[in-house]
Amino acid sequence: QGQIAFARDGKAFDCVASVGLTPDTPYTRARIRTLYGSTQRAAVPAAVVRARTVADANADYRNYVRSERCENGRFRFDGLPDGGWFLIVPVTSGDAPLVLMQSVQTRGGRAVSVTL
């Protein structure tokens, strides 16, 4: 379960539409590093992410990506297997949108609380 509490320069950001959850694999880790400049945590303008080029951009891993609606700054993923994941959250404060990314780990079916 998670919530958006991101602010920059005194402006609070709200989530836009859905939150993506991508499994951490060697391919997705390299892709995330290229797109966001980190595999741990990032806040990058959406236009910058879209402008970056990734190797093998046509690789089809979409069947493994999960998506949930973000409502009132909150989101939740249930039934995740143990492992590493990348949360991808588009946010806006009325200006140019940003994309937040954070790495999370799930273990033993326990809930993980994440604040971005």
Where are these regions (language model features)?
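Long luminal/extracellular ectodomains of secretory-pathway precursor proteins
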Residues: Q1-L116
